């Protein structure tokens, strides 16, 4: 009886697991669920994720099927003696070469995605970013995200200018807390820093994740191709308030107008109407 029980157990629960995995996208249980990535690179990461999931699923079904067959066949006759083997050179070669071949295929298949994400330069650094790019500095600190933008209308033509801007605050800079605005359908360049401990910049809908390390400035490239608001969270345990270190990334059509709006609110003194320059005042130069 116990043999039949264990045979059924190792046969039924894999079937249940496969059914649950099959219906999970429709129930919004799956990761990344039924929400498509909002970046082109994120969509390629999803394709890679589902490819690996498919390979693992086929392997799981084959392994559990073989186990169920052996259990069922062995439970028919309790008097039948088992066959003991001290190993098979041919089998060892097969189950070494096949997994190695699968891993090699995955490694080669993902090289292009990994190159775009971590290796390949997005621009010629001697020339600089395109004027349409957004450049912003994001500083993680317990327990919030501090964002600094260059003054509205600022255009960097070389990376030397970007480094000079990052080195210190400048007149006309725009600041925000826990709210990052980015161009829709244009590349965004973020320089990520930490003011205290290790944090992690994580936007699930964009499939973007990067640790923020104290003493380092790490650049992140991504392009948001869907309008909307996306949750920004810290994915590294950073202290007692880690749970509330949340923000938002919003993709907008007219980023310069949004930055101008933020600048007006930032300069508002409670008396002078936003968007006006007080008499005698002049705008200072920006990098």
How would you name each of these model-derived features?
Residues 59-76:
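Transmembrane alpha-helical segments in integral membrane proteins
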Residues 2, 17-50, 71-287:
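Non-transmembrane, membrane-proximal soluble domains of secreted or membrane proteins
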Residues 46-60:
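Alpha-helical transmembrane segments
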Residues 9-15:
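Hydrophobic alpha-helical transmembrane signal-anchor segments
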């Amino acid at each position: 009886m116990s043999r039949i029980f264990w045979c059924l157990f190792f046969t039924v629960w894999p079937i249940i697991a496969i059914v649950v995995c099959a219906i999970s996208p429709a129930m919004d249980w799956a990761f990344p669920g039924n929400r498509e990535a909002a970046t082109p690179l994120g969509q390629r990461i999803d394709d890679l994720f589902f490819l690996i999931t498919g390979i693992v699923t086929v392997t799981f079904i084959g392994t559990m099927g073989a186990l169920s067959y052996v259990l069922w066949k062995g439970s028919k006759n309790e008097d039948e003696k088992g066959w003991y083997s001290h190993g098979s050179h041919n089998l060892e070669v097969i189950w070494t070469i096949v997994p190695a071949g699968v891993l090699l295929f995955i490694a080669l298949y993902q090289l292009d995605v990994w190159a775009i994400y971590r290796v390949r330069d997005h621009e010629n650094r001697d020339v600089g970013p395109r004027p349409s790019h957004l450049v912003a500095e994001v500083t993680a600190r317990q327990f919030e995200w501090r964002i600094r933008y260059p003054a509205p209308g600022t255009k960097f033509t070389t990376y030397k200018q970007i480094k000079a801007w990052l080195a210190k605050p400048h007149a006309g800079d725009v600041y925000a807390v826990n709210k990052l605005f980015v161009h829709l359908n244009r590349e965004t360049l973020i320089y990520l820093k930490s003011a205290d401990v290790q944090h992690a910049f994580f936007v699930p809908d964009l499939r973007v994740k990067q640790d923020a390390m104290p003493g380092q400035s790490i650049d992140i490239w991504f392009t948001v191709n869907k309008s909307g608001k996306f949750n920004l969270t810290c994915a590294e345990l950073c202290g007692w308030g880690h749970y509330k270190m949340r923000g938002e990334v919003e993709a907008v059509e007219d980023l310069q107008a949004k930055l101008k709006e933020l600048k007006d609110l930032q300069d508002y003194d409670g008396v002078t109407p936003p968007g006006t320059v007080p008499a005698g005042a002049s705008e200072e130069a920006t990098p």
